[in-house]
Amino acid sequence: MKPADWLILQRKVRFGDCDSAGVIHFHNLLKWSHEAWEESIEIYGIPYKDIFPDFSIRKSQIVFPIVNCEANFLAPIKIGDFLKVKIAPHKINTHLFQVNSFFIKNGNKVAEGKIIHCSLDIDSRNKIELPDQLERWIEASNVSTNLKEC
């Protein structure tokens, strides 16, 4: 499997994604950014429940709250647009990682998102090291190559 398989995803803009002006509602860009990295880890081979557990089934000891996020709109994104979503994850330190998302329409970057997550122990709420499987996904993603494409 090549990094492009889990780092370059597709999205079609639907009616419900947009506001009355026919462009995407601002909050959807961050939602799509998060959904892109969720989909990416699944394609890479990390079981969804290992990162986003169902606490009614089993209690995970790690949670990944968002500690910072931002979105930049560079051009209108409208109903019916097909977008390529390129993600670029990287490790900030032992307990923080960032996922950048680039939204491409017809070869042009139209938006970008950034989400930073912190790895915490669920009981103590102390910072803990990122799990090995998440570190492997970040390393395998070869962020420098992915960023050059955007």
Swiss-Prot record:
Keywords: Hydrolase. Pfam families: 4HBT_2. It comes from the Bacteria. Its EC number is 3.1.2.28. One of its GO terms (biological process) is phylloquinone biosynthetic process. Pathway: Cofactor biosynthesis; phylloquinone biosynthesis; Quinol/quinone metabolism; 1,4-dihydroxy-2-naphthoate biosynthesis; 1,4-dihydroxy-2-naphthoate from chorismate: step 7/7. GO terms for molecular function: 1,4-dihydroxy-2-naphthoyl-CoA thioesterase activity; fatty acyl-CoA hydrolase activity. It catalyses: 1,4-dihydroxy-2-naphthoyl-CoA + H2O = 1,4-dihydroxy-2-naphthoate + CoA + H(+). The active site is at D19. Catalyzes the hydrolysis of 1,4-dihydroxy-2-naphthoyl-CoA (DHNA-CoA) to 1,4-dihydroxy-2-naphthoate (DHNA), a reaction involved in phylloquinone (vitamin K1) biosynthesis. Belongs to the 4-hydroxybenzoyl-CoA thioesterase family. DHNA-CoA hydrolase subfamily. HAMAP family: DHNA_CoA_hydrolase. This is 1,4-dihydroxy-2-naphthoyl-CoA hydrolase. It comes from Prochlorococcus marinus (strain MIT 9215).
